Amino acid sequence: MSHKLLAFPRLNYISNFNFFYKNTTKNLILDQNFIGNLYLTSTPTCRKLVTIPSNRNIMTTSSNLKESDSGSILENVATKVLNCQEPEAKSSQKIDTDKVSSNKVESTHIPFKVVPKELNKSSSATATSSSKTKTNLRSIIQPYVKLTKPNLTILVTLSSICSYAISPYTVSLPELLFLTMGTALCSGAANAINMGREPEFDKKMPRTVGRPVVRGLISPKQAYQFAGITGSLGCTMLFLGVNPTVSFLGFLNIVLYSWIYTSLKRKSIINTWVGAIVGAIPPLMGWAASSPLDHPGAWCLAGLLYAWQFPHFNALSHNIADQYKGAGYVMTAAENPKLNARVALRYSLLMFPLCFGLSYFGITDWVFQFDSAIANSWLTYLAYKFWMQIKQNYTGQKPTANGIAMANIHAKKLFWGSVWHLPAVLILAMLHKKGQWDRLLIYSGLKSHDHKSQSSNNIGLI
């Protein structure tokens, strides 16, 4: 039990600490405080009490032992105060009230009152119940958050937001908020259905064995119910807050990912191409929120996300190809490693003309070609190294252990290169959006507004 030490007003001033010494009986009869004005007003310092031997003979009687015990109690208390210990500190220097009473030391003889610090039972019960409520609420919400695959949902939502920002027409903040929330809800619904359909397969892979449906935290039925609620909310928000086209694309993405792609994963390697279409729809959603889909720039952005899926996923699936095969999934990395690496290189090269199309159709300025070429060249180089190693491993002989290890290393480099590549290209496209810097200079007053050139730019964008 912790104690709160409350100091009584002192009665007299004592210039020394003789009553601490064990060769005197003053410690039981003094009614004065042992601390003077000097020690109450100055900064406390740690003092080590040294016993000064007396010339008188000390009789080892029972009364002297009792006096010694009582003196040690007060000495321990005083030492604790002088050492500035916290009330909650666990120490051997505690006041044993039972021992004090047994030695007939009255509380008035102690220079300060000892008040036990006890928690109110009602407040303690309230704090305990609130902590349990928070824990229970977290244990309920967390599995549903994991059910949405938050990392993938964030990536899908960001690709939609970036496309909305790159589109040539003005940006509306309420429209952007509805687009963000609706896209995230639709993506979460698709992922929830995907997890609800594959617990028997996911439990066979170390990568997916920790998913909430596999662990039994959520049943497949609950996953479907959650997907129905979030999907309905997402499509409704997109329909009312953005436009019907975006709402339809969100619903189409749920169907493609959760039913068609998920079913094809166990039947054919074509599932990778279908999954790439799923990744290309969010940029179309962002573009359609402010601009018509008949503009070629929309399809250049969608093509960019479509092509990016292959070096990203093919590199990821290469290192876990055996896990996919053991779980019953049909993936290109497990069925045909050479095709897997070749497709990754092929679509890395496709990034160059797609970025060129953004400048050609007036979405970005021509400086974007030089900036994006650096990122595209790096990704293509990593894909080329990966393809060359796979080609060497499967040319006329069984791959060696060193060759397999090198292929795994190049696959990891390509995967992390793709993780950095996509944000870099999208950010560069937003920075080099057509007329972006002119609008900034006009807004800051560094450039005069040219209505004629502005109207011609708008006509060219339409």
UniProtKB/Swiss-Prot annotation:
Gene Ontology CC: mitochondrial membrane
Single Gene Ontology MF annotation: protoheme IX farnesyltransferase activity
Enzyme Commission numbers on file: 2.5.1.-
Bilayer-crossing regions: 152-172, 173-193, 237-257, 269-289, 296-316, 348-368, 411-431
Cellular compartment(s): Mitochondrion membrane
Membrane-related topology note: Multi-pass membrane protein
Protein keywords: Heme biosynthesis, Membrane, Mitochondrion, Transferase, Transit peptide, Transmembrane, Transmembrane helix
Domain of life: Eukaryota
Pfam family, one: UbiA
InterPro entries in alphabetical order: Protohaem_IX_farnesylTrfase, Protohaem_IX_farnesylTrfase_mt, UbiA_prenyltransferase, UbiA_prenylTrfase_CS, UbiA_sf
One GO process term, biological-process aspect: heme A biosynthetic process
Function comment: Converts protoheme IX and farnesyl diphosphate to heme O.
Family recorded in the similarity comment: Belongs to the UbiA prenyltransferase family.
Protein name: Protoheme IX farnesyltransferase, mitochondrial
